[in-house]
């Protein structure tokens, strides 16, 4: 299992236990992922760290002074 943390700007867009689809954005240097439809965005990853799966399960949603952070677990 692989976990990735996504930044979400407002609450209630996803729930713990929900299955989500992610899309990949490729730049010349790295890749990042977005929970669709434009719910939350991941940090940057190197090409050799790319996801093999495009579907995951929301495991945790944390709120702090910087916003909402969604942890998604992928089956890889």
Task: Annotate the PLM regions.
Residues 1-2, 76:
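Absolute protein N-terminus
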Residues 16-20:
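Loop/turn positions that initiate beta-strands
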Residues 38-50:
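Short aromatic-glycine motifs in intrinsically disordered, low-complexity regions
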